[in-house]
């Protein structure tokens, strides 16, 4: 089954060129199927790129999925055209009365700031509180995971002496959990962050289960006992060249101590090798199937 997206969304042409089944709104309207309703709170600066990456991950589902794109009303994006935001995005006040089957809260390049200093922190707290009653399952990514762990469980983020940057091997700890069903014992995930979560506080949180870890990148995948909150510290949705773009950007900015992403380039070469796409797709499919579709009633009360 296809993903259902607005007719003129830039990601539509890209996904169709990759033979991902995309259905526009007019065609989807005539299908007698209840689509899964997913709201994506997009906090990344390159919004079109993030839209495409996430839709690609969810585009192989046998389910019909309808997406709503959300941005904070208390923050003005600087890297995306106003016309695009006006056409494809909404704000929280427009959806707070609605219920959604799933929600994705993306990362954001603001990890150097205390959470309370983020311009839209109060609004984000309100959205995360709302998600507890109006969303079946919420997937938090990278900074979004750190923000969610801090808000829901009081787990703080900590500064790292050196940026975690590259593609790292992870070990599945609880292989029978539905979120990692079908995973190999070892799998790879891209990471790009200057902060980590406080592992001592995490270990004390009895309502959370850690599903996978990396010797180099730390804890990767965390799920609440009720399966409503999922936290992912890496970026499995990243394209093959996303880390390369970040690396070249940092070099152009003349940032100090810029290191090449680890375990990313082919041996002896300069071309990146994608070793995470299959597991990334499986992760998003497992979330959508087991934590969203199978847990949501056909009609919300």
Swiss-Prot record:
GO terms for molecular function: homoserine O-acetyltransferase activity; homoserine O-succinyltransferase activity. SUPFAM superfamilies: Class I glutamine amidotransferase-like. Its EC number is 2.3.1.31. It comes from Bacillus velezensis (strain DSM 23117 / BGSC 10A6 / LMG 26770 / FZB42). The keyword Protein biosynthesis does not apply. Transfers an acetyl group from acetyl-CoA to L-homoserine, forming acetyl-L-homoserine. It catalyses: L-homoserine + acetyl-CoA = O-acetyl-L-homoserine + CoA. It is found in: Cytoplasm. Belongs to the MetA family. Keywords: Acyltransferase, Amino-acid biosynthesis, Cytoplasm, Methionine biosynthesis, Transferase. GO terms for biological process: L-methionine biosynthetic process from homoserine via O-succinyl-L-homoserine and cystathionine. The gene is metAA. Pathway: Amino-acid biosynthesis; L-methionine biosynthesis via de novo pathway; O-acetyl-L-homoserine from L-homoserine: step 1/1. The active site is at 142 (acyl-thioester intermediate), 235 (proton acceptor), 237. One of its GO terms (cellular component) is cytoplasm. InterPro entries: Class_I_gatase-like, HST_MetA, MetA_family. The record marks 111 as: Important for acyl-CoA specificity. This is Homoserine O-acetyltransferase. The record marks 192 as: Important for substrate specificity. Substrate binds at residues 163, 192, 249.
